[in-house]
Swiss-Prot record:
Enzyme Commission numbers on file: 1.4.3.5
Keywords: Flavoprotein, FMN, Oxidoreductase, Pyridoxine biosynthesis
Binding residue positions for substrate: K58, Y115, R119, S123, R183, L184, H185
Keyword Oxidoreductase: yes
Reaction it catalyzes: pyridoxamine 5'-phosphate + O2 + H2O = pyridoxal 5'-phosphate + H2O2 + NH4(+); pyridoxine 5'-phosphate + O2 = pyridoxal 5'-phosphate + H2O2
Gene Ontology molecular function: FMN binding; pyridoxamine phosphate oxidase activity
GO biological process: pyridoxine biosynthetic process
Protein name stated in the entry: Pyridoxine/pyridoxamine 5'-phosphate oxidase
Pathway annotation from the record: Cofactor metabolism; pyridoxal 5'-phosphate salvage; pyridoxal 5'-phosphate from pyridoxamine 5'-phosphate: step 1/1; Cofactor metabolism; pyridoxal 5'-phosphate salvage; pyridoxal 5'-phosphate from pyridoxine 5'-phosphate: step 1/1
Source species: Rhizobium etli (strain ATCC 51251 / DSM 11541 / JCM 21823 / NBRC 15573 / CFN 42)
SUBUNIT field: Homodimer.
Amino acid sequence: MSANELTSGDFTESGEPFKLFAEWLKEAEASEPNDPNAVALATVDEHGLPNVRMVLLKGFDDDGFVFYTNFESQKGREILGQKKAAMCFHWKSLRRQVRLRGPVEIVSDAEADAYFKTRARGSRIGAWASKQSRPLESRFALEKAVAEYTARYAIGEIPRPPHWSGFRIRPTSIEFWKDQQFRLHDRIEFRRPSPVGAWEKVRMYP
């Protein structure tokens, strides 16, 4: 099945970017071999140099797109410093892409706690043991830290580390791209002046 045979109707007619994203993600979940929620996250350091890495989208609604991380990691420090970020989803099986960018806010403690409890126990231990993005002397040092926290939290619930939580990108721009023949692709961008503004829809040259 081609990308053009998916999503009923012409996606360029949609006026609701979050609803359209939900439709595309659902189709990616049925089509992608793994991790349809994987997304490239771009941040900028204090010198204006960009960094990009893959993360997993863990939620979205009309307020924005949520992912979780160690706030002491490179991406955490850069987001806390610049308070803005960008994402790019690419679903090769569908020949589609979604780009978005905007200011970033921290999710509530209740929201972060609720998600943290859904993680595998080993992943929760790892959130304590890993000094993410810091130099690591050896693999043994990491495994030792994991063993120490495993012993510390052998009984009962594992609390969420104070340095581990979620970010929500509140997009001011969302672009939907669909592959077409001869590189005459469809590009529709939704723009708004602020995270609470009204959307303007613009068709872009490929």
